[in-house]
């Protein structure tokens, strides 16, 4: 069960457990039992698809119960719990509690209860102990009035307990070393650290004179969030007022230690609450006046990213994150004790904070400083020659930690001890003279007042830096307006030294030895990187002055540098591409086509390490390198047909380009939000295009693995939940298989570059292997000149049977598994330790030569290609009992050993290829059979009917040594031969095998073996009803040809294909509409060309 906030865990007075009596114990047990029963009822209701949300209040405790959705709802709506608690408490809400203490109510029963924050989330006891140790050190330092953290001398304080008084510890806990607490006690201390205060009774150097004094522990009532600051008036402190140190404020300590992820509405709520009920010394009942010495403010505790806390007394929420100092020790501890913690940590925010601390610390080391300095990411991106980053893992570009995912963050932390910054020289002076915001400098237009500019810049910064660390200090936050930093920054600050504000500008006179230039950063972070650090800040100006309203220097900003370079590279690419396709004017390069076909379309002469991408994706360094190598760049087009859609987009002509350049020169400073927004949109379009291409690639490869010619939607979730069922080969190193929407542009391009190598292999079937076919919409018209209307066809008109479609891939895989089983058993029967290909034809000719035992009773042994899916499943279930015994040798043993097709490796290599070829041959035969029937669509070939009547259909164009039969019986060599001769294959229908109406109304016209058993009866009944109705109609009405659903049809079959006009119905004039029920329109069909025997073959076509 989740208890509300943190006020529900501690009794209101500092009374020990000896004051509890049996009445309260029995009452608590009864409440726990009833709440557990209530939770069990919620669990039962959830199984009936009923959602329940329940809040129970008992004294100081709040129980949250219900189904999963109900508990999530209540835990996201904390105000509902608070309101209900206030309502139940009534006017006694703000009154001090003087009665018996209320025991903490925790519902241990009921497995669906939401656990309280922490033991499950922070299972590392060592980490908890270090966090509590940090809390005690900070409180002790504040009690001593020190600005830096002083380790707490546990031995001396425990030996002389009169030196220190501790207030606010949870009920029943005494002050001792953190290592002596159990995990629950450690979590209780961390959750209520904002109430704990240390007080020095005498200076530490006085000696242990008062050894009889005990460490004072005074329980403090923890009130709910809504009135926690207002409800402390009645709390009498047991400590002398003059003894309390003013610096030991719980709010500053909490802001100093912890990082929390608080939603925006919570932050705004706290901002509204705090001013209405400020926490003053008089409210606490402490008579000491407001101190004059400096009290650390929220600005003093700005972290390395310039964030400010949400409020001066913001509470700790349930999810307690590790303190920044613990994260600092994780980053800098040389031992391996933190490596398991890094590998198991999945919280992306904690990992990003660790990497942020790592980068800031290493950058400070490179500057020769002893405290963290924010890394100027955008400066490094715009001027990469100034700073070199050494030790970052391969294929991970240096950029903001907030842009990394969990795998890359872990890889960086694993190499944390080898990562270093090398300062080569000072940054470009033009970067130093830019403005403090992350966007390009914005010039004030004459009609734009400073207030509008401030609002626009603030909005611009919010759009670009939401969710990341702010790059400006507290003075910039004040200029941007109140509440901006708190609403955007979701993390509590880390403490830095106050003097760090004065070292923003860094000048390095003696650069270290140079090394190779670092890889230029990706475009994803260039327009949104930080340019606020390392800039000159006018220290002599007051906070009310707006630094961006003063005049700008004449030098160009980084945006002014990179934009012309991008335009020049864009023009260079367009010109070279136009030269390659043979046009005189520049033509826009179809970058996506070059990415999709890297072997047929590529570029030569690009600098080393630079591939063809849009110029917006390059930084300044790479753009300059491309321009330097402009004479050697050449576009190579091996297959011009791939560019048919891309050559129709000429770029602007010379006059338009000149006018555009003049327009840009006239307004060089109007870049701001709109331009960066357009740049961001272009990057989004590129990424979306790449994702669609990768999605299509995966769908195509998955369809090929299933033996289907059309792309099939990849079931990512089902593949993930069935590991090993689908094997994906050929992906670039370091890129796992997952949804394309989770990849960045760089990984998407890498995937597309190896598209030909990617291969899907389905090893075993699972539910949802193939998605269900969708119903198709067909537009039909019954008469010429009539308005066509859409109608929804029956699913089996154009698609295979639904069950077969769903299990098509499963049948193919099951068949191959049974083959492998038989090969394995045959090899064992021969005394070999490997599978041997079973000679099914020899066994069929000599059935007594091999005896197969262990098969299900109703299944004979034969080629697995002839089994249906049910028999295949039965055989696989009984695979442990299947055994072969060779009675008579069918083939020489040397031939078995030397057969190149026998080894398992050869079969496994050709398994996927054989499945694909087999399906392609099936599609070829279906297509040719449909053409022979005069239809413009494939029709399923009735192989069994043709086998029973081999003279009914003549197949021409097959290779000489290959007879026509079901493609399942062909080996891979014959399948390849048939596909090579596909242009010559042709079918001629000599004798009609089945009613033409069945062919037209059902795309699947298999033999009975291919029809599911549960549908055979329905099909046969339908045929009999149709036959009886037609016969009775023809006998009773002489004009039955015009009034029934069946019409005679004559089909030509003289060595040539049927023409559609000879078999498709033509409208007949009729005297009047038919009134017979169930009849449709009246059609007459004539095909008068005789067959080779001079006979006409009637067909039957039902009409609708």
Curated annotation (Swiss-Prot):
Which InterPro entries did the record assign?
GTF2I, GTF2I-like_rpt_sf, TF_II-I
Query: Quick check: keyword Repeat in the entry?
Result: yes
Q: Which UniProt keywords apply?
A: Developmental protein, DNA-binding, Isopeptide bond, Nucleus, Phosphoprotein, Repeat, Transcription, Transcription regulation, Ubl conjugation
| Gene Ontology annotations for the cellular component aspect, listed alphabetically | cytosol; nucleoplasm; nucleus
Q: Specify the signal sequence span.
A: none
Query: Which Gene Ontology BP terms does the record give?
Result: transcription by RNA polymerase II; transition between slow and fast fiber
Residues the record lists as Phosphoserine modifications = 448
Q: Does the keyword Nucleus apply?
A: yes
Q: Glycyl lysine isopeptide (Lys-Gly) (interchain with G-Cter in SUMO2) crosslink: positions? A: 27, 184, 212, 225, 238, 271, 337, 436, 439, 443, 567, 579, 588, 622, 638, 669, 709, 717, 757, 759, 772, 841, 901
Question: Where in the cell does this protein reside?
Answer: Nucleus
Q: Where is this region: Disordered?
A: 509-559, 783-802, 1001-1044, 1058-1104
Query: Where on this chain is Nuclear localization signal (motif)?
Result: 1012-1019
What GO molecular function terms would the record report?
DNA-binding transcription factor activity; DNA-binding transcription repressor activity, RNA polymerase II-specific; RNA polymerase II cis-regulatory region sequence-specific DNA binding
List the Pfam families: GTF2I (PF02946)
Record's compositionally biased regions (Low complexity): 1021-1043
Q: Where expressed (tissue)?
A: Widely expressed.
**Stretches with biased composition (Basic and acidic residues):** 538-555
The GTF2I-like repeats extend over: 119-213, 342-436, 556-650, 681-775, 805-899, 908-1002
The subunit field of the Swiss-Prot or TrEMBL record says: Interacts with the retinoblastoma protein (RB1) via its C-terminus.
Q: Of which family is this protein a member?
A: Belongs to the TFII-I family.
The record's function comment reads: May be a transcription regulator involved in cell-cycle progression and skeletal muscle differentiation. May repress GTF2I transcriptional functions, by preventing its nuclear residency, or by inhibiting its transcriptional activation. May contribute to slow-twitch fiber type specificity during myogenesis and in regenerating muscles. Binds troponin I slow-muscle fiber enhancer (USE B1). Binds specifically and with high affinity to the EFG sequences derived from the early enhancer of HOXC8.
The record, for PANTHER family, names: GENERAL TRANSCRIPTION FACTOR II-I REPEAT DOMAIN-CONTAINING PROTEIN 1
- This chain's protein is named General transcription factor II-I repeat domain-containing protein 1
Gene from which this protein is expressed: Gtf2ird1
């Amino acid at each position: 069960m989740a208890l509300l906030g943190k006020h529900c865990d501690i009794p209101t007075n500092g009374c020990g457990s000896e004051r509890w009596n049996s009445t309260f114990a029995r009452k608590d047990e009864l409440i726990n039992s009833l709440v557990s029963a209530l939770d069990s009822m919620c669990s039962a209701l959830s199984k009936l698809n009923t959602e329940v949300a329940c809040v129970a209040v008992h004294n100081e405790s709040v129980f949250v119960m219900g189904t999963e959705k109900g508990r999530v709802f209540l835990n996201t709506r904390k105000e509902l719990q608070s309101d209900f608690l206030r309502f139940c408490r009534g006017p006694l809400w703000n009154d001090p509690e003087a009665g018996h203490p209320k025991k903490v109510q925790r519902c241990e029963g009921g497995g669906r209860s939401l656990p309280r924050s922490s033991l499950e989330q922070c299972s590392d006891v060592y980490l908890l102990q270090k966090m509590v140790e940090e809390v005690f050190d900070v409180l002790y330092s504040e009690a001593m009035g020190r600005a830096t953290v002083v380790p707490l001398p546990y031995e001396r304080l425990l030996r002389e307990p009169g030196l220190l008084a501790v207030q606010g510890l949870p009920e029943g806990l005494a002050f001792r070393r953190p290592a002596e607490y159990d995990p629950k006690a450690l979590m209780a201390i961390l959750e209520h650290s904002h109430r704990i205060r240390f007080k020095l009774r005498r200076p530490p150097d006085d000696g242990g004179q008062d050894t009889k004094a005990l460490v004072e522990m005074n329980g403090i009532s923890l009130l709910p969030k809504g009135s926690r600051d207002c409800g402390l008036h009645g709390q009498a402190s047991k400590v002398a007022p003059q003894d309390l140190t003013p610096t030991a404020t719980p709010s500053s300590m909490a802001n100093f230690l912890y990082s929390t992820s608080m939603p925006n509405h919570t932050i705004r709520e706290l901002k509204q609450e705090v001013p209405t009920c400020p926490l003053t010394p008089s409210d606490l009942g402490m008579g000491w006046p407001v101190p004059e010495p400096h009290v650390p403010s929220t600005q003093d505790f700005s972290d390395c990213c310039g964030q400010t806390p949400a409020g001066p007394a913001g509470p700790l929420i349930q999810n307690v994150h590790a303190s920044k100092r613990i994260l600092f020790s994780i980053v800098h501890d040389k031992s391996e004790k933190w490596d398991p913690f890094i590998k198991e940590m999945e919280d992306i925010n904690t990992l990003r904070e660790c990497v942020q601390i790592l980068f800031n610390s290493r950058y400070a080391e490179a500057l020769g400083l002893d405290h963290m300095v924010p890394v100027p990411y955008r400066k490094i991106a715009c001027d990469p020659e100034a700073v070199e980053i050494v030790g970052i893992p391969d294929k991970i570009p240096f950029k903001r930690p907030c842009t990394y995912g969990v795998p890359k963050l872990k890889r960086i932390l694993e190499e944390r001890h080898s990562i270093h910054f090398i300062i080569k020289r000072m940054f470009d002076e033009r970067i130093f003279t830019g403005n403090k915001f992350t966007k390009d400098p914005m010039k004030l237009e004459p009609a734009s007042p400073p207030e509008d500019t401030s609002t626009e810049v603030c909005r611009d910064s919010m759009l670009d830096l939401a969710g990341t660390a702010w790059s400006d200090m507290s003075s910039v936050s004040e200029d941007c307006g109140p509440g901006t930093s708190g609403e955007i920054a979701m993390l509590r600050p880390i403490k830095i030294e106050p003097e760090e504000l004065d070292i923003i500008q860094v000048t390095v006179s003696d650069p270290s030895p140079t090394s190779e230039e670092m890889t230029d950063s990706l475009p994803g972070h260039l327009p949104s990187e930080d340019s606020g650090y390392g800039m000159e800040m006018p220290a002599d100006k007051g906070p009310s002055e707006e630094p961006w309203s003063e005049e700008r220097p004449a030098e160009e900003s980084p945006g002014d540098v990179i934009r012309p370079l991008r335009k020049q590279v864009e023009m260079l690419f367009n010109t070279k591409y136009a030269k390659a396709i043979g046009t005189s004017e520049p033509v826009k390069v179809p970058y996506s086509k070059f990415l999709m076909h890297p072997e047929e379309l590529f570029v030569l002469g690009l600098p080393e390490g630079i591939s063809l991408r849009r110029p917006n994706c390059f930084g300044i360094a790479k753009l300059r390198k491309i321009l330097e190598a402009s004479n050697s760049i050449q576009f190579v087009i091996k297959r011009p047909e791939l560019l048919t859609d891309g050559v129709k987009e000429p770029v602007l002509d010379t006059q338009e380009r000149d006018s555009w350049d003049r327009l840009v020169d006239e307004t060089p400073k109007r870049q701001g939000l709109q331009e960066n927004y357009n740049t961001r949109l272009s990057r989004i379009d590129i990424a979306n295009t790449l994702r669609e291409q990768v999605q299509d690639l995966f769908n195509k490869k998955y369809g090929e693995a299933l033996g289907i010619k059309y792309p099939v939607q990849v079931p990512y979730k089902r593949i993930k939940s069935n590991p090993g069922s689908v094997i994906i080969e050929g992906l670039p190193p370091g890129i796992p298989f997952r949804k394309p929407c989770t990849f960045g542009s760089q990984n998407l391009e890498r995937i597309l570059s190896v598209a030909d190598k990617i291969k899907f292999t389905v090893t075993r079937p699972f539910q949802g292997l193939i998605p269900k076919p969708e119903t198709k919409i067909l537009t039909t018209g019954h008469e010429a000149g009539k308005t066509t209307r859409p109608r929804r066809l029956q699913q089996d008109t154009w698609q295979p049977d639904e069950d077969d479609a769903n299990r098509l891939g499963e049948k193919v895989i099951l068949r191959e598994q049974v083959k492998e089983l038989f090969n394995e058993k045959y090899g064992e029967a021969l005394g070999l330790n490997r599978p041997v290909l079973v000679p099914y034809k020899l066994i069929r000719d000599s059935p007594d030569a091999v005896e197969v035992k262990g098969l299900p009773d109703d299944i004979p042994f034969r080629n697995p290609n002839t089994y249906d899916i049910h028999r295949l499943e039965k055989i696989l279930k009984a695979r442990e009992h299947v055994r072969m015994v060779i009675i008579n040798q069918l083939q020489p043993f040397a031939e078995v050993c030397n057969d190149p097709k026998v080894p398992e490796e050869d079969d496994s290599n050709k398994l996927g290829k054989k499945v694909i070829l087999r399906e392609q041959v099936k599609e070829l035969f279906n297509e040719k059979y449909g053409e022979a029937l005069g239809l413009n669509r494939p029709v399923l070939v009735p192989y069994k009917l043709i086998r029973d009547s081999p003279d009914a259909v003549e197949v021409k164009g097959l290779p000489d040594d290959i007879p026509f039969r079901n493609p399942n019986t062909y080996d891979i060599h014959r399948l390849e031969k048939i596909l090579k001769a596909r242009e010559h294959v042709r079918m001629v229908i000599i004798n009609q095998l089945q009613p033409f109406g069945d062919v037209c109304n059902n795309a699947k016209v298999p033999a009975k073996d291919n029809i599911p058993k549960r549908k055979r009866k329905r099909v046969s009944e339908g045929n009999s009803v149709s036959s009886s109705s037609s016969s009775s109609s023809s006998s009773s009405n002489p004009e039955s040809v015009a009034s029934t659903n069946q019409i005679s049809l004559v089909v030509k079959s003289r060595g040539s294909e049927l023409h559609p006009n000879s078999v498709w119905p033509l409208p007949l004039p009729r005297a009047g509409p038919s009134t017979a029920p169930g009849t449709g329109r009246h059609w007459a069909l004539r095909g008068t060309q005789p067959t080779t025997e001079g006979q006409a073959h009637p067909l039957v076509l039902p009409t609708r």
